[in-house]
Regions:
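Intrinsic low-complexity, intrinsically disordered or marginally ordered coil/linker segments
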Residues: 1, 42, 73-74, 84
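Negatively charged, low-complexity tracts enriched in Asp/Glu with abundant Ser/Thr
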Residues: 1-48
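Short, intrinsically disordered, low-complexity terminal/loop segments
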Residues: 2-3, 106-108
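Short, charged/polar surface micro-motifs in flexible loops or helix N-caps
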Residues: 44-47, 54-59, 69
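Residue-level detector of beta-strand face positions
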Residues: 50-52, 77
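Short aromatic-glycine-(Arg/Gly/Cys) micro-motifs in beta-strand/loop hairpins
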Residues: 62-83
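Mixed-charge, glycine-accented linear interaction segment located at domain edges/termini
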Residues: 77-106
Length: 108
């Protein structure tokens, strides 16, 4: 059925708690004037939350969920422009701390 809210078999996507954490961070950064748009994608092996300064640009950051790395390096990663992994771990809240004020600054 086309309107079935469940993800297709084999698809990876974010859970409600994870989306809540991501949207809280996004709202805080939009209020600070640093971010303008976002996008989410659920793929067969990972899910991606992309963050944009302008909708027509490449993403500034990507928050990736890769369940196959959960027992290794951690399923969560924040990836910057150019594919640089800024932080990786097992807990989303800890990984998102890379965006805490004073720890990281966007440079144009």
């Amino acid at each position: 059925m086309a309107l079935d809210p469940r993800p297709a078999a084999g698809m990876v996507f974010f859970e409600r708690r994870e989306i809540d954490l991501l949207m809280r961070l996004y709202g805080r950064m939009v209020a600070a004037g640093e971010w303008r748009d976002y996008g989410m994608a659920g793929l067969t092996d990972h899910a991606v939350f992309s963050i944009f300064r302008h909708a027509a640009e490449a993403p500034l950051y990507r928050v990736e969920k890769r369940p196959d790395l959960a027992r290794k390096q951690g399923q969560w990663a924040v990836v910057g422009q150019g594919g640089v992994v800024l932080r990786r771990g097992h807990d989303l809240a800890q990984v998102l701390r890379v965006f805490d004020k004073g720890r990281f600054k966007v440079v144009d």
